[in-house]
Amino acid sequence: MPKIKTVRGAAKRFKKTASGGFKRKQSHLRHILTKKTTKRKRHLRHKSMVAKADQVLVVACLPYV
């Protein structure tokens, strides 16, 4: 049986935590930032966790993580 390929885009976006979850970066922080408040941008800088409903999809993209 052949090896399963890792989705490289997903490997760059998600990191597995010690408890088995996945951490991710928040979106909306690349461009069009002048209309967003400093508080909003500051909160978007922090990492977030992948939701349980989406975790199955992330695991399918990262078979060896």
UniProtKB/Swiss-Prot annotation:
Residues 10-26 have a biased composition (Basic residues). InterPro entries: Ribosomal_bL35, Ribosomal_bL35-like, Ribosomal_bL35_CS, Ribosomal_bL35_sf. Residues 1-26 are annotated as: Disordered. Pfam families: Ribosomal_L35p. One of its GO terms (molecular function) is structural constituent of ribosome. SUPFAM superfamilies: L35p-like. GO terms for cellular component: cytosolic large ribosomal subunit. Keywords: Ribonucleoprotein, Ribosomal protein. It comes from the Bacteria. Transmembrane segments: none annotated. Signal peptide: none annotated. GO terms for biological process: translation. PANTHER family: 54S RIBOSOMAL PROTEIN BL35M, LARGE RIBOSOMAL SUBUNIT PROTEIN BL35M. Belongs to the bacterial ribosomal protein bL35 family. HAMAP family: Ribosomal_bL35. This is Large ribosomal subunit protein bL35.
